[in-house]
């Protein structure tokens, strides 16, 4: 099959499959997200301009950096691994992120995660009962996240959580349908981290080479404040300045990060 013509900014990436059982699904994904369709991943060796490859492998979508194969592949997995461990043993409503968004007895906010990425924090909030709308502007990241959510819906342990997560592929907060009416807008813009775990270092390296620096992060705060009903929560490294240098209403400090909380109005107390 000849490759599907993709938009110019995606010319350095293609989508293929490892096992033929995934070939039809890989074709559908390439068409849905407008990626070049590669066919079998072995064909990448004949296309020297390719820098990245999305591959269907064991029924999951993965991202690889072709010139650094030792980095391995990135995929979204809400069923096993670190995300599953955090869901089971992460501390429930006592977690700092739950406090930051105002989650409490009788109030489970609708959270718009406007920098969804791989969806880890969104999944934590969804597992605590929040309704999540996820906004991701990069098609590669959105495709990975969408695949992870859809696979999670097929797993009986996390299907209810995944069904609480709605993904929007869009370029900006200004484009978000006002009918969504989030209680809280959550922001976690990319920021150069000093200390990284091996996994985070791998992901940051691949994503920064793929999407570049997050130069417009400061521009997120004002539209987020306009959209949120009660508050905006910004996750920052502990050493980073506040987003747009705007002092938050309060901060929740952790070991390496903090949550800056910008309160618009008090969350109403539940009626008892």
From Swiss-Prot:
Residue numbers binding S-adenosyl-L-methionine: 120-121, 136-137, 171-172, 188
Alphabetical UniProt keywords: Cytoplasm, Methyltransferase, rRNA processing, S-adenosyl-L-methionine, Transferase
Keyword Transcription regulation applies: no
EC number: 2.1.1.242
Compartments, record wording: Cytoplasm
GO MF annotation terms: rRNA (guanine-N2-)-methyltransferase activity
Gene Ontology CC terms: cytoplasm
Enzyme class: transferase
InterPro entries, sorted: 16SrRNA_methylTrfase_J (IPR007536), SAM-dependent_MTases_sf (IPR029063)
Chief location bin: cytoplasm
Classification via Pfam families: SAM_MT
Catalytic activity: guanosine(1516) in 16S rRNA + S-adenosyl-L-methionine = N(2)-methylguanosine(1516) in 16S rRNA + S-adenosyl-L-homocysteine + H(+)
Family under the similarity heading: Belongs to the methyltransferase superfamily. RsmJ family.
HAMAP family listed in its UniProt record: 16SrRNA_methyltr_J
Function: Specifically methylates the guanosine in position 1516 of 16S rRNA.
Protein name per its UniProtKB record: Ribosomal RNA small subunit methyltransferase J
């Amino acid at each position: 099959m000849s490759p599907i013509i993709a938009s110019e900014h995606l010319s350095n990436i293609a989508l293929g499959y490892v096992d033929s059982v995934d070939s039809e699904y890989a074709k559908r994904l390439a068409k849905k997200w407008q990626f070049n369709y590669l066919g079998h991943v072995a064909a990448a060796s004949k296309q020297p301009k390719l820098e990245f490859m999305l591959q269907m492998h064991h029924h999951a979508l993965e991202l690889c950096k072709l010139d650094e194969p030792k980095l391995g592949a990135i995929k979204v997995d809400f069923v096993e691994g670190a995300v599953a461990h955090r869901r089971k043993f992460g501390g429930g409503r006592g977690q700092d992120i739950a406090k930051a968004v105002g989650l409490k007895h009788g109030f489970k906010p609708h959270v718009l995660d406007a920098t969804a990425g791989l969806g880890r924090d969104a999944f934590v909030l969804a597992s605590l009962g929040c309704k999540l709308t996820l906004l991701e502007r990069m098609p590669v990241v959105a495709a990975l996240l969408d695949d992870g959510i859809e696979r999670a819906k097929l797993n009986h342990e996390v299907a209810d959580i995944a069904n609480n997560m709605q993904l929007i592929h869009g370029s900006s907060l200004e484009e978000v349908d006002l009918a969504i009416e989030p209680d809280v807008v959550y922001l976690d813009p990319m920021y150069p981290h000093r200390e990284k775990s091996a996994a985070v270092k791998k992901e940051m390296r691949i994503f920064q080479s793929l999407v570049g620096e997050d130069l417009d992060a400061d521009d997120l705060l004002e539209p987020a404040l306009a959209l949120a009903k009660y508050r905006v929560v910004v996750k920052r490294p502990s050493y980073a300045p506040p987003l747009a240098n705007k002092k938050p209403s309060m901060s929740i400090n952790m070991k390496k990060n903090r949550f800056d909380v910008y309160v618009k109005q008090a969350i109403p107390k539940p009626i008892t």
